[in-house]
Design a protein with these regions (language model features):
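Non-catalytic accessory segments of hydrolases
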Residues: 1-134, 157
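Active-site loop->helix "elbow" adjoining a glycine-rich segment at hydrolase catalytic centers
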Residues: 75, 134-138, 166-169
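Primarily recognizes the serine-hydrolase "nucleophile elbow" in alpha/beta-hydrolase
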Residues: 151, 158-192
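Short, well-ordered amphipathic alpha-helical segments that serve as non-catalytic structural scaffolds
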Residues: 139-147
């Protein structure tokens, strides 16, 4: 917690994931996780690009018209990736009058654990649902935060589009299908 304005210009740590090392493979070179990017279990951050705010502190001014909001969910086979990827920087979309938010979520076993004991616990509870899709819940928490707070960044909480690519595309489908998300967003774009 802090008081006043927090000027957050750097990406937070990304989720724990394998790195390609010194690979010269095209995919690793172009989209692989940069070993210089810090990784941590403390990885649940949002990045916001908004054309609505001008300046900082006392000089800041919010546009009077609420802007549409786009929430980005990155891909990477639920194993790698993050909000830091230069290919998915929200600067250009925001320059066109859209508030862009990228949502971080846990990956690999931290986000999508599967184990026979989880199934057994679900059977014992009687609901048949193993609670291990933490990555999807992280995404949902990010979308909910956007819904509750995006107006402070000039965005319209009633005009939210969730979009993603690859595993982010499948995540968008999961978010669409979840009854927990009723009313959190209005539109979706699935890219692969």
């Amino acid at each position: 917690p802090w008081d006043g304005v927090l000027q957050a210009f750097d990406f937070g740590p990304t989720a724990m994931q394998p790195t390609p090392g010194a690979s010269d493979d095209f995919y690793d070179r172009e989209w692989g996780t940069d070993p210089a990017v810090p990784m941590s279990e403390d990885c649940l951050y949002l990045n916001i690009w908004t054309p609505a705010l001008r300046g900082y502190g006392a000089d800041s001014m919010v546009a009077s018209e609420k802007l549409p909001v786009m929430v980005w969910i990155y891909g990477g086979a639920y194993q790698c990736g993050g909000t830091f990827e230069k290919e998915f920087d929200g600067t250009h979309l925001a320059a066109n009058g859209v508030v862009v938010v990228s949502v971080a979520y846990r990956l690999n076993a931290f986000g999508f654990m599967t184990h026979p004991l989880l199934h057994e616990e679900a059977v014992e509870r009687g609901d048949g649902e193993p609670y291990a899709n933490f990555g999807f819940l992280d995404q949902r928490a990010g979308i909910q935060w956007v819904k509750e707070n995006i107006a402070k960044f000039g965005g319209d909480p009633e005009n939210i589009t969730v979009f993603g690519q690859s595993a982010g595309d499948a995540s968008v489908l999961a978010q669409i299908c979840s009854p927990m998300n009723h009313g959190l967003f209005q539109k979706a774009i699935m890219q692969s």
